[in-house]
C-alpha cells in the first residue's frame, strides 16, 4: 500500500482489490488484480494467510506495524491536534484551529465537500475517512466547484448532513449557488475561509516563478461581506472573527 509517507517498494508484489475497474492498475501495475469487495476479500484472505504463514507472518506484521505506528494516520492525527490547539487563540483565526473545530463539530455520517484550497492543509490528518462517499475534494481543475458541488452531493444524499468548505476566492466564482441551496431548502453548512485574497494563486506564483507581483489577487478595496451576501441570497449567516466562537457557531 502506498501513501504520501511511505512510497511503494520498488520490488513489491502488488495485489489490488477493488470494485472500480478504472482504479485497478492506475498508479501501480498489479501482479494480481481482483474485481471484488475489499472487506469480503479480506475476510477470506486473512484466514488463508494465517494457515499458510502461521506465527512467522505474525512476527513480520508486528514489526511493520510498530514501524508504521510513528507515521500512520492515528499518529499524525494526534500531532496535528496538538499543534492546532497551540494556535487556539491566534488572530486572525489559524486555519488548522478552524479545521479542528469543523471536524469535531461534524455529526456522524456527515459528508465533507472541500474547496478551501489553502486553509485545509490539516484536514487530511484530522478527518477520518469512513466511507467512499464521505469526502469530496478537487485535485485540480477549475476554481469555484465547491459550493455547487455541495448542492449536488446533498441532493444525492438527502439523509446525510453535508458541510462545504470553500475559500473566499473559490466562493466568488459560484456564490449564486447559495441562492439555489436556500431555494431548495437544503440543510448544507457552508464555511467560507476568508483571507481576502486568491492565496492559492499567490502561492503558485511565488513557488513556480519566484514572483510576488500579485496583480488582481486581493479582495480589500472593498472587502467582501460574505455573511451579508449570503443573507441577501436567503441563507442564514454569521461572520466569525474570534477563535473561541467557531464551535458554538457550527
What are these regions (language model features)?
Residues 25-27, 33-35, 39-45, 122-250:
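Thiamine diphosphate
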Residues 1-69, 205, 250:
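Glycine-rich, acidic loop regions that bind phosphate or pyrophosphate groups
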Residues 70-154:
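Active-site diphosphate/adenylate-binding microenvironment
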Residues 56-87, 153, 195, 200-207:
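Charged, low-complexity, helix-prone segments enriched in Lys/Glu/Asp/Gln
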Amino acid at each position: 500500500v502506498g501513501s504520501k509517507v511511505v512510497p511503494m517498494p520498488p520490488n513489491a508484489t502488488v495485489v489490488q482489490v477493488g470494485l472500480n475497474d478504472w482504479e485497478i492498475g492506475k498508479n501501480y501495475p498489479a501482479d494480481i488484480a481482483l474485481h471484488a469487495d475489499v472487506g469480503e476479500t479480506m475476510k477470506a484472505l486473512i484466514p488463508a494467510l494465517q494457515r499458510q504463514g502461521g506465527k512467522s507472518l505474525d512476527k513480520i506484521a508486528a514489526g511493520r506495524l510498530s514501524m508504521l505506528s510513528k507515521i500512520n494516520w492515528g499518529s499524525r492525527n494526534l500531532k496535528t491536534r496538538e499543534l492546532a490547539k497551540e494556535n487556539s487563540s491566534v488572530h486572525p483565526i489559524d486555519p488548522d484551529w478552524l479545521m479542528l473545530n469543523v471536524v469535531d463539530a461534524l455529526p456522524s455520517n456527515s459528508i465533507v465537500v472541500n474547496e478551501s484550497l489553502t486553509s485545509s492543509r490539516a484536514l487530511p490528518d484530522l478527518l477520518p475517512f469512513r466511507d467512499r462517499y464521505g469526502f469530496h475534494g478537487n485535485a485540480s481543475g477549475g476554481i469555484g466547484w465547491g459550493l455547487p458541488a455541495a448542492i449536488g452531493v446533498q441532493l444525492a444524499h438527502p439523509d446525510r448532513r453535508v458541510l462545504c468548505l470553500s475559500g473566499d476566492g473559490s466562493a466568488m466564482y459560484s456564490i449564486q449557488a447559495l441562492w439555489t441551496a436556500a431555494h431548495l431548502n437544503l440543510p448544507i453548512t457552508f464555511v467560507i475561509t476568508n483571507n481576502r485574497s486568491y492565496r492559492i494563486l499567490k502561492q503558485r506564483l511565488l513557488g513556480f516563478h519566484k514572483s510576488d507581483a500579485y496583480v488582481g489577487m486581493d479582495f480589500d478595496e472593498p472587502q467582501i461581506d460574505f455573511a451579508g451576501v449570503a443573507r441577501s441570497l436567503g441563507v442564514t449567516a454569521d461572520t466569525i472573527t474570534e477563535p473561541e466562537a467557531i464551535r458554538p457557531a457550527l
